[in-house]
Amino acid sequence: MGTVKSIAQKKKGSFWDHKILRELAEELERYYSDPSSFDPKKLEALAFEFFNELKKVLKEVGVLSQMKQGLKSKAPTAFGFLKKALHLIQSDEVDDFGLDRKFELSIKPFFDFLFTHYFRVSVSGIENIPNEGRALVVANHSGVLPYDAAMIKIAIFNEHPARRELRFLVDDFVFHFPFLGILMNRIGGVRACPENAERLLKSDELIAVFPEGIKGISKKFSDRYRLQRFGRGGAVRLAFKTQSPIIPVAVVGAEEIHPLLYKSTTLARPLGIPFFPVTPTFPWLGPLGAIPLPTKWTIQIGKPITYPSITSREINDGILINRETEKLRETIQKMVLELLKERRSVFFSD
Amino acid sequence: MSTSLKTEGLVVVGAHTILGELLIEKLEANPDIEKFWVIDLHPPTRGKFKKLQFIKMNLTQPAADALLAEKLKEIGAKTLVHCALKNNPSHNPGDAHELEVIGTINILSALKAAQLTKFVVCSTTMVYGASPKNPNYISESAPLASHPESHFVRDKVDAEKQIAALQSDEPTIKVSVLRFALIVGPRSENYFTELLRRPIVPTLLGYDPLLQFIHEEDAVYALLLATFGDYAGVFNIVGKGVIPLSYALREAGKINFPVAPFFAYPFIQVLWNFNISSMPGKLLDYFRYLWVADGEKAREVMKFNPKYSSKEAFLDLAKNVRIQEFSWAQ
């Protein structure tokens, strides 16, 4: 176990050479290629060891202490922690759509950790994001929990020279939930509806939409990287209406973080969620099962697509919108397939 | 903003809501106006009025419409400003319903009979309903809340529907509907300002909605603009920007007491029944979800630019609450 300490001291990414992680990853990769060889007991044992390792690594990297500093919390007593947790989501200064920059920066270290150490996201084509002005980022959606939105946001914030703020449109059901609704809102999410998107684009913001929506994050593992229908063409209609370029983005790696074996709508209804996920780890391992698998991610940002200005009558032309939407879907699908061709391993960067 | 023609035959219904009170004072102070009429059950209590002609009338009595029409004809009324929609939820929803819905219907029939040319209504943005399905800024064309649980909101939606019907039936009457955000200021007294008079304010655990306010001075200015100008249609009258509820409570120096929504609704309802809470449990949705309205149309069409943003309006209220608390302590 002496290795753990050396792990953190080594360069970024190299701690993935650890024995348990490698074993776990190989096990999963074997399972991905041949589902019949699935041995839940072995995987469970490996997963537990992995979580223990992860806890130590987290401690070593110092994410938690960084976050604590960000929140300026003192010695954690039970009451103090509760108070902090309640005050965590209380904002001083929010913009017109509820984004709280201070809060955003205080939880950013966690997502930075995911970005650089956990998912080891490599980003290409960042120069395709304009330095200023409105643009609509359209990406494929996957992975049960929307980590892909967070990673695209971090990618643009960390790697783009203008450090642009990305806002994203979130499905309404999120805003029914306590805490989750505020959390999403304070880090830049707004409810996905044409009114909000139009208003944001008109004030020259950069916004992300995932036209696959719930269908995207709830696709079964066997359907991975097969892009679903792009809603009802809302994204393209919006681009036409507000004359904003669409920037296609392909995310590879997010599909495998929570391999969805089965989804239950019966269990989901009383909980008020769109589907109840069943993965190799969830709900079997309880809350631990909600930890995403450490896959290696690639985000490719494509060339902007601009649309000619058209009359208001043509905006209502369903056939035109549908055709353009399908074209966009094919573009992103092609980008995803090309990235998949280049990828040699689900978990390792080499 | 004032043309001499429009100032004749001005009738205000409702002298005891915040907008009614402020409007009457502004009209009294306006040198262009020689005379105006006020209809209510009781005469206004604040200040002395020389130009004001008070007409005592109960809008909910049987045949109130015929009586009102007669009066309006008699005084040669041209414009009617309807400020009688309540600011606060009532402990007697039956009476409130009679006043808000039946009273409005009576006013509308009298308007038609007396052939008035202009009708201004003070409504509220609460009619859109609070819901996670609302866009962040609701425009005037959005549908009204379909089945509001609260009597307070349901009556207002009902009254607005009657007014919308009038708009399409009688094109000769210019109807302006002003939907105000939460009105705050040193003189405002409503369920929200009442909330701040308590040291501990219960909130919903896990929810922190963005609230929008309009200062009472801005609100009455918008009302005057609509009364003297020709702006038919529906307008949201709101301050710029939003503030989170938790921030508002901290600025006012209140203790935020989060309660799980499951318990909060019955808990607040019981407090309301005992007259401790300033609002019934059913209004809690307005402290849970979004109901922020878009003021763009009023800015463009009416050229209405509020002096106070939502935050400034709220801080003005918070300041006054603190002053009052201090003088109580003395």
Per-region residue spans from a language model:
Chain A
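Soluble catalytic domains of membrane acyltransferases
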Residues: 3, 13, 116-300, 304-306, ...
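Basic, polyanion-binding surface patches
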Residues: 6
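Membrane-anchoring hydrophobic helices of lipid-metabolizing enzymes
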Residues: 11-155, 161-166, 170-188, 192-195, ...
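C-terminal terminal-subdomain/extension
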Residues: 292-350
